[in-house]
């Protein structure tokens, strides 16, 4: 079974089934949180649900990117809205970690030639990343969970002195790393695997005046208004105090003044 976003969700749940003739049928089993529905798929062909979706589906872009199936730009989205280092055997995230979209194979090779070391994480970016804060006090916001895996070698590197600054690519990477550092310190039995990797659901909400244990610099795009990611970025701008909020507003004002591109296909900033 799969957790899916359905449109229209409630009406589909009442009907119980949907599908495409000679391709697949699907049963809607129950509703979950954040607009998710648990669905069991029955492909007509002998193929996996992932292969079925690759063959019939289109790239699930964020809701603020307006595309139709016949839009000529849609053909490029399959390549553009995916990092060059994505693991195709672990395709369950609802969105790309968009800070990584700026990297090309040539850029990665150039950075490695200059001495940079890379560690890959598995990030299952969740639909909650798009949910805005809708309360007056951020402490009342119900933060979303996102599953992640940090391989053993990467986690060992995080625990040792670094020869240079540790640069996280994207806010989801920061959240996962900081969650892992705290979780392995307080309850390692809940997340450490026998081979030394870390697997868990990040459930921490990072906002000023939070500090950071294992990340020294951050590459991140420009985010949506009222996003929890803005809270994380403002904390990262000035760890341990509230000054990052004012700095973040100034940075975004400058970006608007100079016509920077925002959101998934937009520009990025490097915070050191």
Residue ranges: model-predicted function:
Residues 1-272:
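Surface-exposed, charge/polar-rich loops and edge strands
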């Amino acid at each position: 079974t799969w957790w899916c976003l359905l449109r229209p969700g409630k009406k589909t749940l009442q009907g119980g089934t949907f599908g495409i003739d000679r391709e697949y049928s699907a049963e809607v089993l129950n509703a979950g949180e954040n607009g998710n529905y648990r669905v069991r798929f029955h492909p007509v062909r002998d193929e996996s649900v992932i292969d079925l979706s690759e063959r019939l589906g289109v790239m699930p872009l964020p809701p603020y990117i307006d595309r139709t199936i016949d839009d000529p730009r849609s053909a490029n989205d399959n390549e553009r809205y995916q990092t060059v280092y994505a693991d195709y055997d672990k395709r369950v995230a609802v969105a790309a970690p968009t800070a990584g979209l700026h990297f090309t194979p040539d850029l990665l090779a150039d950075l490695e030639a200059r001495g940079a070391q890379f560690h890959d994480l598995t990030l299952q970016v969740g639909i909650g990343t798009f949910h805005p804060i809708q309360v007056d006090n951020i402490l009342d916001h119900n933060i979303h969970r996102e599953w992640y895996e940090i391989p053993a070698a990467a986690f060992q590197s995080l625990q040792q002195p670094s020869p240079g600054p540790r640069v996280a690519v994207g806010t989801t990477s920061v959240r996962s790393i900081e969650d892992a550092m705290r979780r392995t310190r307080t309850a390692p039995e809940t997340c450490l695997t026998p081979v030394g990797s870390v697997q868990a659901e990040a459930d921490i909400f990072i906002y000023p005046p939070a500090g950071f244990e294992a990340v020294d610099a951050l590459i991140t795009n420009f985010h949506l208004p009222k996003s929890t990611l803005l809270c994380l970025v403002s904390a990262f701008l000035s760890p341990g105090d509230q000054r990052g909020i004012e700095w973040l507003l100034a940075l975004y004002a400058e970006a608007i003044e100079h016509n920077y591109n925002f959101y998934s296909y937009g520009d990025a900033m490097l915070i050191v």
